[in-house]
């Protein structure tokens, strides 16, 4: 949708003509959105990612993950969601994963879906990570480049450590090694900014 918006601006700037209908049609994606589901053999693995990444076409990590799981004889079931704080979305995820008999969850989402009051967890039957009673792996995506990661002696920086390890542990998620790094894909002088994208790491 954002790409269509930019195309509209280009038409107005250059031609000042009517914008083609193809750029005016807005796509709608349900929440959660099922992505790249196939009928295939193998144990089913649930994958949860933010829908904002899908809308920004930031899906290389998900595609590489699906590919590797299929090479291992597994069946990935990817869902893009807006948030895990919404109990309605969590309920939908639980229904889908129970119906599909998901054996393991891999999530790229940050924060925590658990509610905390007075430093204690509040029991919630609709919490996806506690009600399904299956292992949950936290896939780590570093906000630094792989080169900076390798040259650093501290490992995860403070923001990655907080958002992807410390807070998600409230959900009982199992921490993994970094599977993606934020790399510069182009530099635009007109934007005065570097354009970055998460790139899947073959080792992770």
Residue ranges and their predicted role:
Residues 1-204:
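An N-terminal assembly and electron-transfer interface module characteristic of large anaerobic redox
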């Amino acid at each position: 949708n954002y790409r269509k918006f930019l195309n509209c601006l280009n038409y107005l700037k250059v031609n000042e003509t009517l914008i083609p209908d193809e750029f005016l049609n807005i796509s709608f994606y349900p929440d959660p959105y099922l992505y790249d589901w196939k009928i295939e053999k193998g144990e089913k693995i649930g994958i949860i990612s933010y829908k904002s990444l899908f809308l920004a076409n930031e899906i290389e990590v998900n595609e590489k993950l699906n590919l590797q799981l299929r090479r291992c004889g597994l069946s990935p079931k990817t869902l893009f969601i807006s948030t895990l704080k919404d109990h309605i979305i969590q309920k939908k995820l639980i229904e889908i994963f129970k119906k599909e008999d998901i054996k393991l969850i891999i999530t790229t989402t940050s924060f925590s879906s658990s509610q905390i009051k007075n430093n204690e967890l509040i029991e919630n039957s609709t919490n996806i990570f506690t009600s399904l009673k299956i292992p949950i792996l936290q896939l780590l995506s570093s906000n630094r480049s792989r080169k900076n990661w390798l040259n650093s002696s501290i490992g995860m920086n403070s923001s990655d450590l907080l958002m992807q390890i410390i807070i998600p542990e409230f959900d009982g998620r199992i921490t993994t090694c970094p599977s993606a790094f934020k790399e510069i894909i182009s530099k635009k002088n007109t934007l005065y900014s570097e354009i970055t994208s998460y790139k899947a790491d073959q080792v992770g």
